């Protein structure tokens, strides 16, 4: 495996691409072979991203009562989870949280709302006002995760200063009907294209541990590569009581690290950020995400679950011999 990995890494650095067959071999790696896979992923991260780790924080700006039936989600109105339910926060509240994120070293701050899409009118106008104020009063790059997107809304977000639009595909097309039935995969793909056409960067990735096969993890990665995504968030399922996936078994740490490595090989020059489920899935192996190829991580709290202390995450970065970036 060592010689194969050396050849693959050299070819990628010279402008080549990981093939589907090579992707399958990475997903089959274990033991010492996985060590070589991770070493190659680390070399690619160092080559394309250096030693800087991007820190991302989010605000749950509107929670619960979502009409979508995503089988993993605490905020779906189809399930009884006890997750917080509240309307859109005011622009002032969102800006205050962005300023706090700025002071704590975040390079990106995401405004995240529940629901299939942002409501036109007062709801959208409040978000646009928050984006404009964040651009004027902080050093961070604001992003938005507001669900499905049309061209008019995308242009308004871009004009207000939204740097990045976040919209996960969640899983491979072939597995998506097992996870969500209230909208079509093509709607997600169109949202990505609309955001890019409006001039925003796109942050788009997936959630792993939903019951998908290794082949479907590769399928999703190939889709993201073809979409020319700017940054890739990798999430791992943190099972939520009350959802259909409440009893799902979290991925083993080495399996999760293998996914991170695969995506670094597939998209060597893109930011790969490890987000939700990091603690539950990786446990004592959280610092290994950088050896597996990750160049960023979400810090602070997630949408409906608590994250680690920021000081612990920053220490993890510096203990790995890396630095954390500002915008």
Swiss-Prot record:
Cross-referenced SMART domains: BATS, Elp3
Domain of life of the source: Bacteria
Cofactor(s) named in the record: [4Fe-4S] cluster; [2Fe-2S] cluster
Catalytic activity: (4R,5S)-dethiobiotin + (sulfur carrier)-SH + 2 reduced [2Fe-2S]-[ferredoxin] + 2 S-adenosyl-L-methionine = (sulfur carrier)-H + biotin + 2 5'-deoxyadenosine + 2 L-methionine + 2 oxidized [2Fe-2S]-[ferredoxin]
Family, as annotated: Belongs to the radical SAM superfamily. Biotin synthase family.
Family matches, as HAMAP family: BioB (MF_01694)
Protein name: Biotin synthase
Originating species: Syntrophotalea carbinolica (strain DSM 2380 / NBRC 103641 / GraBd1)
């Amino acid at each position: 495996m060592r010689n194969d990995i050396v050849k693959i890494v050299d070819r990628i650095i010279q402008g080549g691409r990981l093939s589907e067959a090579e992707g399958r071999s990475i997903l089959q790696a274990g033991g010492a072979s996985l060590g070589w896979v991770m070493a190659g992923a680390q070399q690619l991260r160092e080559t394309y991203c250096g030693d800087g780790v991007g820190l991302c924080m989010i605000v749950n700006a509107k929670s619960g009562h979502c009409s979508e039936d995503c089988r993993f989600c605490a905020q779906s109105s189809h399930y009884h989870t006890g997750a917080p339910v509240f309307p859109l926060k005011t622009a002032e509240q969102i800006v205050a949280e962005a300023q706090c994120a700025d002071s704590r070293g975040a390079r990106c701050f995401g405004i995240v709302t529940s629901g299939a899409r942002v409501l036109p009118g007062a709801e959208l106008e409040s978000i646009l006002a928050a984006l404009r104020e964040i651009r004027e009063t902080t050093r961070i790059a604001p992003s938005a995760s507001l669900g499905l997107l049309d061209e008019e809304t995308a242009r308004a977000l871009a004009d207000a200063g939204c740097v990045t639009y976040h919209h996960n595909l969640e899983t491979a097309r072939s597995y998506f009907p097992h996870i969500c039935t209230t909208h079509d995969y093509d709607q997600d793909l169109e949202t990505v294209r609309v955001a890019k056409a409006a001039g925003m960067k796109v942050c788009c990735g997936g959630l792993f541990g939903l019951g998908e096969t290794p082949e479907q993890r590769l399928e999703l990665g190939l889709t993201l590569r073809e979409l020319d995504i700017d940054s890739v968030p990798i999430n791992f399922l943190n099972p939520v009581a009350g959802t259909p996936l409440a009893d799902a078994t979290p991925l083993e740490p080495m399996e999760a690290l293998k996914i991170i490595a695969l995506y670094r090989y597939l998209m060597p020059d893109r930011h790969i950020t490890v987000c939700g489920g990091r603690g539950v899935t990786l446990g004592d192996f959280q610092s290994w995400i950088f050896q597996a190829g990750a160049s960023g991580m979400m810090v602070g709290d997630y949408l409906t679950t608590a994250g680690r202390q920021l000081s612990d995450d920053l220490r993890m970065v510096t203990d790995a011999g890396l630095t954390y970036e500002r915008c």
